[in-house]
Every structure is written in structure tokens, then in C-alpha cells.
Swiss-Prot record:
Matches recorded under SUPFAM superfamilies: Ribosomal protein L16p/L10e (SSF54686)
Protein's name according to its UniProt entry: Large ribosomal subunit protein uL16c
Organism from which the protein derives: Nephroselmis olivacea (Green alga)
CDD domains (alphabetical): Ribosomal_L16_L10e
Gene that encodes the chain: rpl16
Entry similarity comment: Belongs to the universal ribosomal protein uL16 family.
Keywords of the record: Chloroplast, Plastid, Ribonucleoprotein, Ribosomal protein
Membrane spanning residue stretches: none
Length: 134
């Protein structure tokens, strides 16, 4: 699963999930792409599940580009802990995805296989998505 090697700060603020992506919202590498239609956090597990689904359906054919990276640590407190005593420890990593951001791209496979594999990957995502073609 994806995670940064090192970060400047261990425990970032949660931030706001509003607005749309001003960069990374066009197809750059492949012929087909998955585009987010809503803002959301995508965990490294969800990214890996979508990548695996796409590569398995395409039978390791073609090339896949992952256009997002989980660089935000999400902290959690232990169960049944009293309030106070600081912020929790980092548990998992998420990519902050805004609406219209391209998540995955694919090239080198027929259109039917590309669309079918991307449709499976879309079900792994926590937001509404659509499939684009160059």
C-alpha cells in the first residue's frame, strides 16, 4: 500500500473537502481515465484495491497510472480513552481528492476491457466517479 517515506508534520489538520480540482483534472498519460465527481478522502487500501481489480481484469495487459497519492495521515485514539492527553497516533493514510480530479488512467488495452476493468475499480472508490476517454 502507498504511504509517504517521510513527512514534514506527523499529524495534519483535517481540512475542508469543498471546491473542485483546478489541476489534475484532464487525461495526461493514458487513453481512458476514472474521474471523481465528488470530493472525498481515498485511503491507501482503496487505491490498492482498485489497482488490483484493474490489473486482474486486464490480465496484466496495458499500463495503469495512479494519479493520486495518500499523503495525509489520519489519526485515531485508542478505544475507551478519556478526553484530553493529546491527539491520537497516525492509523492510516488518505489522498485528499476534490471533484473532477483524475484518479486512474489506462492505456494499451481494448476499449471494452478498459471500461469493464475501470467500472470494477469505480466500485472500490468512496465517491461517485465516471469513466472518460481521450
Amino acid at each position: 500500500m502507498l504511504s509517504p517515506k517521510r513527512t514534514k508534520f506527523r499529524r495534519p489538520h483535517r481540512g475542508h473537502r469543498r471546491g473542485r480540482a483546478l489541476r489534475g483534472n484532464t487525461i495526461a498519460f493514458g487513453d481512458f481515465a476514472i474521474q471523481a465527481l465528488e470530493s472525498s478522502w481515498v485511503t491507501s487500501r482503496q487505491i490498492e484495491a482498485a489497482r488490483r481489480a484493474m490489473t486482474r481484469y486486464a490480465r496484466r495487459g496495458g499500463k495503469i497510472w495512479i494519479r493520486i497519492f495518500p499523503d495525509k495521515a489520519i489519526t485515531m485514539r485508542p478505544a475507551e480513552t478519556r478526553m484530553g492527553s493529546g491527539k491520537g497516533s497516525p492509523e492510516y493514510w488518505v489522498a485528499v481528492v476534490k471533484a473532477q480530479k483524475i484518479l486512474f488512467e489506462m492505456k494499451g488495452v481494448p476499449e471494452t476491457i478498459a471500461r469493464a476493468s475501470m467500472r470494477i475499480a469505480c466500485f472500490k472508490m468512496p465517491m461517485k466517479t465516471r469513466i472518460l476517454q481521450r
